[in-house]
């Protein structure tokens, strides 16, 4: 069945799902370019897609921000059509056997700090910094890290008056507990400092392979959040970053020292990691741990795609009712 959305996009197979809807591969009928199509039921209890689309519009033009092509309502669905990207940092972390080299972690830190600073410069905080929400580009953009998923983002200051949102307590945890800042666990309203602290935990997750508060047994969500908070607060930063360069300790201590309304010194944090990078003798060549692994998979995917293209066009019956392709191909690396 030929399903079209946004006037000129053909809906393809499902390539992923998030907490607020499903993501499909799409094709621009005029150009043949592939896109990502995100769908969310209009009957969703907490619709977020139209809000997220508006965020992408506000962030338009930023390096590492996916291009928004169209958003609106089609039938029973809120629809957002954006640039198709490659795998997430979580996917790539798994491809690399769940451990990244210091060189790769530092190149990621540089780009991720840039993305967070840009979002903050547009008066928003992300509030869900995690490896799943950073994707690499495709083709010529394979060395660019993109920030995605702005459904939980919040305006932290008035663009006109520059007035900061007020300090509040008693807030429920927004985001992902594993990477949430200590203040977020304590129920304090999030601000710029919390995005940066979360990034610190992401970087240590990549360095170590896991975080000390992962895999804790709990009976309820609240119990789990409480146990994560207790473990996070009782693990000294020096212990968390043990056997890794002191810059990671300095980074997290700096983030935790910031006051609610403080503007972080992004340049200082980038310089911290860049100095370490060059002191270690690394070349800023955009060759990550996964570069060759991913390129190899991508070539194999394209080869198989070409082999199967002819067969697919005349053999739609091969797909089962769910839309899955039982031909047993390599797993797709798109989001």
From Swiss-Prot:
CDD domains: STKc_CK1_delta_epsilon
Compositional bias ranges of the Basic and acidic residues kind: 317-327
Enzyme Commission number, as recorded: 2.7.11.1
Catalytic activity, reaction form: L-seryl-[protein] + ATP = O-phospho-L-seryl-[protein] + ADP + H(+); L-threonyl-[protein] + ATP = O-phospho-L-threonyl-[protein] + ADP + H(+)
Family matches, as InterPro entries: CK1_Ser-Thr_kinase, Kinase-like_dom_sf, Prot_kinase_dom, Protein_kinase_ATP_BS, Ser/Thr_kinase_AS
Residues involved in ATP binding: 15-23, 38
Catalytic site: 128
Record's keyword annotation contains GTP-binding: no
Residue span(s) of domain Protein kinase: 9-278
Class in the EC hierarchy, top level: transferase
Superkingdom of source: Eukaryota
Region (Disordered): 304-335
Kinase keyword on record: yes
Family per record: Belongs to the protein kinase superfamily. CK1 Ser/Thr protein kinase family. Casein kinase I subfamily.
Function as written in the Swiss-Prot or TrEMBL entry: Casein kinases are operationally defined by their preferential utilization of acidic proteins such as caseins as substrates. It can phosphorylate a large number of proteins.
Protein name: Casein kinase I
Organism: Eimeria tenella
């Amino acid at each position: 069945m030929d399903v079209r959305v946004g006037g000129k996009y053909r809906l393809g197979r499902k390539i992923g799902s998030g907490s607020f809807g499903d993501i499909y591969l799409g094709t621009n009928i005029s150009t043949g370019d592939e896109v990502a199509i995100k769908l969310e039921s209009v009957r969703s209890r907490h619709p977020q897609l139209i809000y997220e689309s508006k965020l992408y519009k506000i962030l338009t033009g930023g390096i590492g921000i996916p291009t928004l092509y169209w958003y609106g309502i089609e039938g029973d669905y809120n629809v957002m059509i954006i640039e198709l990207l490659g795998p997430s940092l979580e996917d790539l972390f798994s491809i690399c056997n769940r451990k990244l080299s210091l060189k790769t972690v530092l190149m990621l830190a540089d780009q991720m700090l840039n993305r967070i600073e840009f979002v903050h410069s547009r008066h928003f905080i992300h509030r869900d910094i995690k490896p799943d929400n950073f994707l690499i580009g495709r083709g010529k953009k394979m060395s660019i890290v993109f920030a995605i998923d702005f459904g939980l983002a919040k305006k932290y200051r008035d663009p006109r008056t520059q007035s900061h949102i007020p300090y509040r307590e008693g807030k429920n945890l927004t985001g992902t507990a594993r990477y949430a800042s200590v203040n977020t666990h304590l129920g304090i309203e999030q601000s710029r400092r919390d995005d940066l602290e979360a990034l610190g935990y992401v970087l240590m997750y990549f360095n170590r392979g896991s975080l000390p508060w992962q895999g804790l047994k709990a009976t309820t969500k609240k119990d789990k959040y409480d146990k994560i908070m207790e473990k996070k607060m009782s693990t000294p930063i020096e212990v968390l970053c043990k056997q890794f360069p002191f810059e990671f300790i300095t980074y997290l201590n700096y983030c935790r020292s910031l006051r609610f309304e403080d503007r972080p010194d992004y340049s200082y944090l980038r310089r911290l990691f860049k100095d370490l990078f060059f002191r270690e003798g690394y070349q800023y060549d955009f060759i990550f741990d996964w570069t060759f692994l991913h390129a190899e998979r991508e070539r194999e995917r394209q080869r198989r795609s070409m082999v199967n293209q002819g067969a697919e066009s005349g053999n739609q019956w091969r797909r089962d009712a769910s839309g899955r392709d039982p031909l047993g191909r390599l797993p797709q690396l798109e989001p």
